[in-house]
């Protein structure tokens, strides 16, 4: 079942970049592009995910943008509330700062920092219960793809979280981002045909898990660039993009937003 009627999302994941002066300049340049070439809110949801210490600064900078641009946290604690947890930022603390969106399950969190299924379920559940919208990342390694396990791995990652997501949360608070691990930061991109095939399988799996399955946005994240955005955006089950390196250039990021806003 196609998700072509879903309003697309484009989210820029800045990762551990850039320095403050460059971040300020990046936001101002992006705002100027939005002012000159406005894209209606209803045509595309747009977000940026800066480092945690810049969340409220970026949020304040975006207040006078020509359209809504959400500020997205890159991660959240597996511990809820407040307490003696040095270095942690809970979903409740994010919400208290009016940060309503968060990434959970990015492959760099899984691979570098050891976020396993139980940790990710706790992070997801805390964020959802705090009222946040979660962009939940799934994806396979090159080895898993070459062994023919890509679909099995990705669908299992989604099934793993099903016990902690309510029907209402699936409907209103969950976005899925498919990020083939082998395409992140490598310059390699799944062909639009391969990406669409995986997105269609994810859509099928979501529809089996929840009645909301046909309404959940599925983003593609794997070296999305201005040069390939139009072709990716034309795929019926690709409902947006989780953009890495290209989001650190205002013009490139704007072109990706424009591609998805004009595609649906």
Swiss-Prot record:
Record family assignment: Belongs to the triosephosphate isomerase family.
UniProt-listed Enzyme Commission number(s): 5.3.1.1
InterPro entries registered for this protein in UniProt: Aldolase_TIM (IPR013785), TIM_sf (IPR035990), TrioseP_Isoase_bac/euk (IPR022896), Triosephosphate_isomerase (IPR000652), Triosephosphate_isomerase_AS (IPR020861)
Enzyme class label: isomerase
GO molecular function terms attached to this record: triose-phosphate isomerase activity
Positions of the catalytic residues: 106 (electrophile), 179 (proton acceptor)
GO CC annotation, single: cytosol
Signal peptide: none
Localisation per UniProt entry: Cytoplasm
Descriptive protein name: Triosephosphate isomerase
């Amino acid at each position: 079942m196609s998700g072509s009627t879903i309003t697309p999302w484009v989210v820029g994941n800045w990762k551990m970049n850039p320095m403050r002066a460059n971040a300020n300049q990046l936001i101002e340049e992006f705002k100027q592009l939005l002012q000159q070439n406005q894209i209606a809110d209803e045509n595309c949801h747009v977000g940026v995910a800066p480092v945690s210490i810049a969340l409220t600064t970026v949020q304040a900078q975006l207040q006078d943008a020509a359209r809504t641009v959400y500020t997205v946290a890159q991660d959240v604690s597996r511990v809820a509330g407040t307490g003696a947890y040095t270095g942690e930022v809970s979903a409740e603390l994010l919400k208290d700062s009016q940060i309503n969106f968060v990434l959970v399950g990015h492959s760099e969190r899984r691979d570098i920092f050891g976020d396993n299924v139980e940790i990710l379920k706790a992070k997801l559940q805390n964020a959802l219960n705090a009222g946040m919208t979660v962009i939940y990342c799934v994806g396979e390694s090159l080895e898993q793809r070459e062994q023919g396990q890509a679909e099995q791995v990705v669908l299992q990652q989604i099934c793993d979280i099903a016990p902690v997501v309510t029907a209402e949360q699936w409907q209103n608070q969950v976005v899925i981002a498919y990020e083939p691990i082998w395409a992140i930061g490598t310059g390699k991109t799944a062909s639009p045909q391969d990406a669409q095939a995986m997105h269609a399988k994810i859509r099928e799996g979501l529809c089996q898990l929840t009645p909301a399955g046909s309404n959940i946005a599925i983003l593609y994240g794997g070296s999305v660039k201005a040069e390939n955005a139009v072709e990716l955006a034309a795929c019926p089950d690709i409902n947006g993009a989780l953009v890495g390196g290209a989001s650190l250039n205002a013009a490139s990021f704007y072109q990706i937003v424009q591609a998805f806003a004009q595609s649906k």
